[in-house]
Curated annotation (Swiss-Prot):
It comes from Clostridium kluyveri (strain ATCC 8527 / DSM 555 / NBRC 12016 / NCIMB 10680 / K1). Keywords: Lipoyl. SUPFAM superfamilies: Single hybrid motif. This is Glycine cleavage system H protein. Binds 1 lipoyl cofactor covalently. The glycine cleavage system catalyzes the degradation of glycine. The H protein shuttles the methylamine group of glycine from the P protein to the T protein. HAMAP family: GcvH.
């Protein structure tokens, strides 16, 4: 299991790469491995406002449909439209296959370091 140290994480298994007042968001390696092969990604619209901790998109795998929670508050600035045609990219390269870019970010204080997130994953595996 891979936990890049330069990223931040959530307990609901999203990764966050903060770049100034913007952030890229994706699903962690653990999330994609638990979901199985992804077959569909339902992305939000650019310009949508999101609230930290609330559902803002969903993904479907061969196992189930799953909600994805916004790790931060802000405004959707960009969505990764490549995932609409290639949702399996998340399984292949979870830390490259970002879902959205959020601008005007807020509510960073609940994000976890790689070490904190690894402890969350290890406790879920037990």
């Amino acid at each position: 299991m891979n936990f890049p140290k330069e990223l931040m994480y959530t307990e609901s298994h999203e990764w966050v790469k903060i770049e100034g007042d913007k952030a890229l968001v994706g699903l962690t390696d653990y999330a994609q491995s638990e979901l199985g092969d992804l077959v569909f990604v339902n992305l939000p619209e650019e310009g949508d406002e999101v609230t930290a901790g609330e559902v803002f998109l969903d993904v479907e795998s061969v196992k189930a449909a799953s909600d994805v929670y916004a790790p931060l508050g802000g405004v959707i600035e960009e969505v990764n439209e490549e995932l609409l045609d290639r949702p399996g990219w998340i399984n292949e390269a979870p830390y490259e296959a970002w879902l959205v870019k959020i601008g005007e970010i807020s509510d960073r204080e609940k994000l976890l370091t790689a070490e904190e997130y690894e402890a969350v994953v290890n406790s879920e595996k037990e």
